[in-house]
């Protein structure tokens, strides 16, 4: 009978999962000026960005240097941003996590009036040995339009049973 008390790789996978989860927790709980160092959680050629946009194409920031520049822009445009109601979900892959959360704060985009932005988000994190390889953010773009005082068209969905 084979020994199944410690399958090969089981302990290592759990340790890796916990290491990666700690990185995701740190990313999601980083606030204020500390956001200027969040790029340090990424691998050198890591990327992050917004996968739901008004254009239909993602905005992808590639590489630690560009992620650092993005942090400066983000702090200027979302000065008091915070994620809350954070729920982190592991997957069968110790290097992949999903996060469901809410976020809120001022939105200061040049050319638009100052607004207050609230939305519901999903994040996909792909990691490598405790560092983020790719972070994809998904949200309801209409909520951002509303926060910027941009009129949102209404879709008629006649007949939907609710």
From Swiss-Prot:
Swiss-Prot/TrEMBL GO biological process terms: phenazine biosynthetic process
Lineage: superkingdom: Bacteria
Pfam assignment, any one: PHZA_PHZB
Pathway the protein takes part in: Antibiotic biosynthesis; phenazine biosynthesis
UniProt KW rRNA-binding keyword: no
InterPro entries named in the record: NTF2-like_dom_sf, PhzA_PhzB
Cystine connections: none
Induction of the gene: Under control of LasR. In liquid cultures (aerobic), phz1 operon is induced by quinolone signal via 2-heptyl-3-hydroxy-4-quinolone (PQS). In biofilm (microaerobic), phz1 operon is not induced by PQS, because the biosynthesis of PQS by the monooxygenase PqsH requires molecular oxygen.
Gene3D superfamilies reported in the protein's UniProt record: 3.10.450.50
Known partners and oligomeric status: Homodimer.
Family: Belongs to the PhzA/PhzB family.
Entry protein name: Phenazine biosynthesis protein PhzB1
Organism: Pseudomonas aeruginosa (strain ATCC 15692 / DSM 22644 / CIP 104116 / JCM 14847 / LMG 12228 / 1C / PRS 101 / PAO1)
Organism lineage: Bacteria, Pseudomonadati, Pseudomonadota, Gammaproteobacteria, Pseudomonadales
